[in-house]
Amino acid sequence: MDAVVNLTTLPYRRSVGILVFNHEGKVWVGRRLMVCIHEDTKIYHRWQLPQGGIDENEEPLDAARRELYEETGIRSIELIKEAKYWFHYDFPQEIVGSVLGSKYRGQIQKWFAFQFTGELSEIKINPPPDGHKAEFDQWKWVDLETLPSIVISFKKHVYMKIVNEFRGSFKGL
């Protein structure tokens, strides 16, 4: 039987989240590969924005650019806006033992919005560039407002904040 982890004693993992707007003002989302959380529980194909951890001594903006490239191959971007605040979410108790080795209670994220200035052929998710592990099996452009309705439930409140933070940020080319 697995030991129960006391979430309140664990720190949040510092990470970044990335919105990429296309020339029509739609946002890039990727469909996560199936994640096996526990032998009895599987999370199938949820959509999410690119995100990832901030390395030691790395600035959040640099981490955002790195994570975006590692997960999507996208490099042709221009910064539109950095979120004013950090947003956080907690992992559900039942997945803490499987996510990030039980070291974190959740993630605290700095979010960035970018304008995609490249060609669609630049986007490579499976496999992503430079031997990085694939995280997505499909991608599409969606309206910013739809994001909270397509993500896993424990991230929904953060995505609602992201929509509020970045609504009106897209200026077009």
UniProtKB/Swiss-Prot annotation:
Q: Which family does the entry's similarity section mention?
A: Belongs to the Nudix hydrolase family. RppH subfamily.
Keyword Cell cycle part of the UniProt annotation: no
CDD domains found in the cross-reference section = NUDIX_Ap4A_hydrolase_plant_like
**Required co-factor?**
a divalent metal cation
MF-aspect GO terms: bis(5'-adenosyl)-pentaphosphatase activity; guanosine-3',5'-bis(diphosphate) 3'-diphosphatase activity
Motif interval(s): Nudix box: 52-73
Q: One Pfam annotation, family name? A: NUDIX
Question: Gene3D superfamilies, alphabetically?
Answer: Nucleoside Triphosphate Pyrophosphohydrolase
EC numbers listed for it are: 3.6.1.-
Which residues span the membrane? Answer: none
Q: Which UniProt keywords apply?
A: Hydrolase
* Function per UniProt: Accelerates the degradation of transcripts by removing pyrophosphate from the 5'-end of triphosphorylated RNA, leading to a more labile monophosphorylated state that can stimulate subsequent ribonuclease cleavage.
Nudix hydrolase domain location: 11-164
* InterPro entries documented for this protein: Nudix_hydrolase, NUDIX_hydrolase-like_dom_sf, NUDIX_hydrolase_CS, NUDIX_hydrolase_dom, RppH
The protein's matches in HAMAP family, at most eight in alphabetical order, are given as: Nudix_RppH
EC class name: hydrolase
Biological processes annotated in GO: nucleoside phosphate metabolic process; ribose phosphate metabolic process
Query: Which Cys pairs does UniProt list as disulfide-bonded?
Result: none
Report the protein name in the record. Answer: RNA pyrophosphohydrolase
